[in-house]
């Protein structure tokens, strides 16, 4: 969302672009004492409080994903997670653990020379690739 514009997402996409730029600016301002990097997470459905039942149903309807309102909330969330996963190169849902792993890596000594970068944890969301 920070690099690829789309209709109906002006404020959201602008905020993402601003956050990415802030990471780069802070990396410059705080170096060499502090390394600043950012994570660009994809949609995490499982375990997210952002997806109560009504929002899940709204998203399933928006994306024309077949469902039955009698299905339990977790089954509906799984359908939505699989839809998002299907748009990625890895075809697997992104989890909170995936995000945590990337955050841990960024704070570890393994990436001690990395600064001013945005790490995407999105399963290879090719729609977000820079053109």
Please provide the spans of the model-predicted regions.
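Generic structural signal for alpha-helix termini and adjacent loop/cap motifs
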Residues: 108-112
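Conserved loop-to-helix N-cap of the C-terminal "lid" that shapes the substrate pocket in Rossmann-like
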Residues: 38, 73-81, 92-100
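Short-chain dehydrogenase/reductase
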Residues: 23-24, 100-103, 107
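A glycine/serine/threonine-rich, flexible loop-to-helix segment
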Residues: 44-87, 130-131
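Catalytic loop of short-chain dehydrogenase/reductase
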Residues: 1-18, 23-31, 41-51
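Short C-terminal tail/terminal secondary-structure segment
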Residues: 103-104, 114-131
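Conserved SDR Rossmann-fold cofactor-binding beta-strand/turn motif
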Residues: 36-45, 107, 120-122
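Active-site loop of short-chain dehydrogenase/reductase
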Residues: 7, 32-36, 117
């Amino acid at each position: 969302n920070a690099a690829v514009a789309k209709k109906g997402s002006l404020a959201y996409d602008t905020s993402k672009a601003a956050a990415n730029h802030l990471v780069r600016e802070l990396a410059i301002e705080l170096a060499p004492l502090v390394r600043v990097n950012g994570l660009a997470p994809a949609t995490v459905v499982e375990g997210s409080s952002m997806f109560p039942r009504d929002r899940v149903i709204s998203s399933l309807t928006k994306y024309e994903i077949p469902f039955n309102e009698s299905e339990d909330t977790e089954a509906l969330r799984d359908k939505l997670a699989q839809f998002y996963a299907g748009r990625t190169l890895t075809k697997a849902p992104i989890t909170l653990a995936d995000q945590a792993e990337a955050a841990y890596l960024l704070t570890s000594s393994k990436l001690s020379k990395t600064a001013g970068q945005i790490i995407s944890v999105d399963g290879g969301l090719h729609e977000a690739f820079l053109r």
